Amino acid sequence: MSTSDRTWIGRAPGRVNLIGEHVDYLGGVVLPAAVDRFTTVRGHPADDWSMASGVPGGLPYARAVGEELGASPQALSVVSDVPPASGLSSSAALLVATAAGLRPDLDGAEAALACQRAEQRATGVQVGVMDQFAAALGRRGHALLLDCGTLDYRLVPFPGDLVLAVIDSGIHRSLADTPYNLRRREAESGMPQRRRHVESEIRRVHEFADALEAGDRSALGELLKASHRSLRDDFEVSTPEVDALVERAWVAPGCLGARLMGAGFGGSVLALLEMGAKDPFREALPDVVVRFCNTADGAYAR
């Protein structure tokens, strides 16, 4: 039943992608986790769509998902601590929070797919499904192993004494101003160097999930490092500045491993830390913004 005829509230988390980069749009397997940064949307029926919030440019996204779900116009207010352009997928958090408020009865996978269609409509970009699935179906203490081709998924336990650190490289570029689209076309066309990354990254995703279940922390770190080297050398989406930041993270206290996260050419670096290492890790990287996260429940976690 729709709640769009009364006041409603929806909340959804940001997400990190532990491993599985540049494979989602090729139907590969990814391993995201919902994290404890949240977007909360409050709404009620109105004559037209509007949004009062500190989320710049958020209205087209919320309106698109509302229309996708058949909702009447809504007046929305949004509070969020999911920073934009941080690698935590603030857009998916906004979309899924809006869907959860308007249609709490939806199955989480249905909601995620509706949000994917809405984002494609709002942006004109053929976005994948990973971000929306993580925001909808993530579970505290778990990562989400998702096959982007079949949409099969399962939860993988994530240790409560490991911390996720998202490091802002300070380099922010529009993907239109980078070779991102070229890299994607090269991978889709089967260019051997790009396919080598895709195939090895999919193997690393499965190995990472196995290492989580086995409690093999050394393997987790080595897989993150191997993922970065592959993104750097085979997919060629890193930059010298990002490489230097990743290598600094590798030798920082308590860091198991780190890699470029996201589309590349700047953006964020993901590091996996021992719980007690937050302060020494931040002290080792005093010149960049570091955000520490833990796993969290998704909007449709049951």
Model-predicted segments: where are they?
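Anion-binding (especially nucleotide phosphate/pyrophosphate-binding) glycine-rich loop
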Residues: M1-I9, D36-A118
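C-terminal nucleotide
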Residues: S2-R15, I19, T40-G57, R63, ...
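Short Gly/aromatic-enriched secondary-structure transition segments
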Residues: G27-V35, N181-R184
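Buried hydrophobic packing segments
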Residues: L31, A62-L69, L94-L102, F133-A134, ...
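Cysteine-centered functional microenvironments
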Residues: V55-G58, S77-L88, C115-T123, M130-A134, ...
